Amino acid sequence: MTLDHDVATRLQRRSLAWRLGASTTAAIGVVLLTWALTVDFVKVSNAGFFGDAATYYTLGHSLATDLDFEFQRDDLARVWKEYASGPEGLFLKRGSDGRLFYAKAYIYPLAAAPFIWLFGTNGFLVLHAILMTLCFLCAYSFLCARSHPVSALVFAFAFLFISIVPVYVVQIAPDFFIFAIVLTGYYFWCYKEVAPLISELQLATWRTRWLLGPRSDLVAAVLLGIGAFAKPTNILLIAPLLVSPLLRSQWHRAVKIGVTFGLVVVALFALNTAVSGEWNYQGGERKTFYSGGGVDFKGGFPFQDDAKTFDSVGLARVGGGSFDVLFTRDTLLEVFRRNLAYFVVGRHTGFAIYLFPGLMAIILFLAATRDRAMWQWLTLGAGVGTAVALLLYMPFTWSGGGGPVGNRYFLGTYGVFLFLVPPLQTAVGGLLTLAISGLFVMRIVANPFYASTHPSEHSKSGIFRRLPTELTMVNDLPINLQPDRTRQPLGGTPPIFAYFIDDNIYNREGDAFWVKGESTADLLLRAPISPETRAAGVEEARSLRIEKLTVILETGARPNRVTINAGTGPRVVEMAASSQQSFDVEMPRGVPYKYHPDYPTNYVYSLSIASSSGFVPMFESGSPDSRFLGVMVRLIPAYGASQ
C-alpha cells in the first residue's frame, strides 16, 4: 500500500527530527494505551492494595460514580466488587460537620475520574498512559531543540523508561501524576529558552504561540501550582520561574507568574475547605483502617456494619511535623549528615541508583561549560533545594511511608533535571545512561507490578548489597511490609529488635536464628526503650544504647568460618563442626531514630554475618529440614543509657 502523493509530499517537507519524534511518540502512545485498556489490573496487583492505593481508588470511583468527595457506605461496598480483601489502608478524616472524607489530596483522583467513568479501574492506567506519552513528547521536543534527533530520542527514553518511573505508572497513586505535571510545567517554561529561531509566520501558529510566548509561563505556573497542592514539598519548584524574570528586570512577568501560581494553590485549598470544612486535606481527626486490628486499635471499616464506626475502629494518626523532632541536635548534626549520603546512594532510596538519568543530566550540565544558562542554574538550585528541604522536614520518612521503591516523595522533582541536559551531538551520553541505569533498575522495571507489591526483593541481592542501608528510616524500609522479618525480639532485657533485610537469614526460632550457608546476611538492630520507675511510681521511657553485643554461634554438621562486622571492624571466628563459641563485639554509637516527639529516641545499628560453609540437615541426619544452614546465632545486648 502506497501513501497518497499529497501526504508523502507533506511528510518529505518535515524534518528528520519531527518525523522521528512524531512516529516514536505515536508508537509509545499506542502501546501504552492498549496496555492500559487490556491489562487485568486486579489480578496483576495480587487482588489487593498497597501503600495509599485504597484511598485513591475509593475516592476516584466516588468522584466518577457519585460526583462527590464524601466517604459513604456505597463507596465501601463498591470496593468489594473487585477486591475481596477490602480497602486495606483506607485513610479517612472527619470533617467539621461530622461527615467523613478522604484524607488525601483530591486532585489526582479528580483528574482520573472521567477515565474511571469510561473504563472503570483501568481508567487510572489510561490517564497514566496519556501522561507518559505527553512526558516523552515534552522530553524529546526539549532535547531535540538543541541536540541530534537520535541523541535526543535515546536520552528521553532513558530518562523516562530506564528509571523507577514505570514502577509508579502501574500504581494507583499520585506520585507519577505529580511527576508528569511538574515535567510538563517546566517544559512550558523552558522550551522557549532553547527553541530555534523561527519566522514571524511560524510564530503566528497556535503551537508556537503557546510555547514561545508569555502564555507558556502562565501554563507552567498553573501546572506547578497543581503539583504544589498535591505535594507541598514541591513548592520550591516555582522559584526559578520567579527569579529568572527578576534577573532580567521583567517585573511584570514575574508578578503574573507568582499571582497565577498563588491563585491556583489557594483555589485548590479553598475547594478542600468548602468540601470538608478544613483547608488541610490531611489535618484534623484522621484514621487509617484495616480489616484486621492491632495492639491498640480494632479492625474494620466505617459503615461495614452497625457496630463499626469512625470512632470504634481504625488507627488514629497525628498530622503535621514537629519542631521538637526537626530541630534537635541529633537530627541536624547526625541524621541530616547521614541522610545526605543515603539520599544519593542509599540501598532502597538512592537518587544515583533509582533515578540515575537525573544524575547524568547534572553531570552533563556541569561538564558543558559553554552551554550553561542562568535559568538552568536556577533549575538545579530548585531541585537540590527541594531535596534538602525534604531531608530537613521529614528526617525519618523522607522517601515516603508504606515501603516504596526508591524515593517516591522526590519523584515529582526528578523531572526538572531533564532540563539541565546540554546539547547532545552524539548518543554516547544517552547510551551510557541506559547502561548504568539499567544495571540498577532493569530488574525492577521488567516487572513493575511485582516490584510494586514486593518492593524489597530487588535490594536483597546483587549490587544493592554493597550500598548503605538507610538506618534513619528503619520503620519505613520496604522490608517492613513483611511482619515476620521486622521488629523481631531477640535476646536482652528488654529484648533487642531485629530487622532481617535479606533472605540470607531464616525466620527467628525463639531468640535465635540461622544464617543461610555460604552467604552473608545483613540485619538491623534497634535498641528498645526501657521504662524507668520514678519515686512517685510513674514509669517514664528511657532511651538505651547498645554498648556491646554478646554473640553466641553454633555450627551444625560442617566446620565453618564465620565473620561478624558491626561497623567497628570484622571479627573472624574459625569453628569446628557441631561446636559453639561466644564472644563480645564492641558496638558503634548507633544512629538516632526519633520519628515522633511523643516517643523517646531509639538507636539503630547495622550488622553483617557471613557463613563460609553450610549443610542440609535432610542429607546429614535424616531430618525433614531441607534448609541450607550455615550457623545459628544468638545476640545478647549490653545496654547503656543514652547521654
Predicted regions and their residues:
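Hydrophobic, aromatic-rich transmembrane alpha-helices
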Residues: 242-245, 343, 350-383, 417-422, ...
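Perimembrane helix-loop-helix junctions
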Residues: 4-6, 193-196, 236-270, 363-373
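Transmembrane-helix motifs of polytopic, lipid-linked glycan transferases
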Residues: 123-147, 180, 184-187, 366
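Membrane-lumen/periplasm interface segments of specific transmembrane helices
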Residues: 254-364, 380-393, 442-451
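Start-transfer (signal-anchor) and selected internal transmembrane alpha helices
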Residues: 1-44, 141-144, 214-216, 253-260, ...
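Membrane-interface alpha helices of multi-pass inner-membrane proteins
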Residues: 60, 155-160, 207-231, 238-245, ...
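Interfacial juxtamembrane loops and adjacent helix segments
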Residues: 65-108, 112-116, 287-334
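Specific aromatic-rich, kink-prone transmembrane helix
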Residues: 138-141, 158, 177-209, 216-224, ...
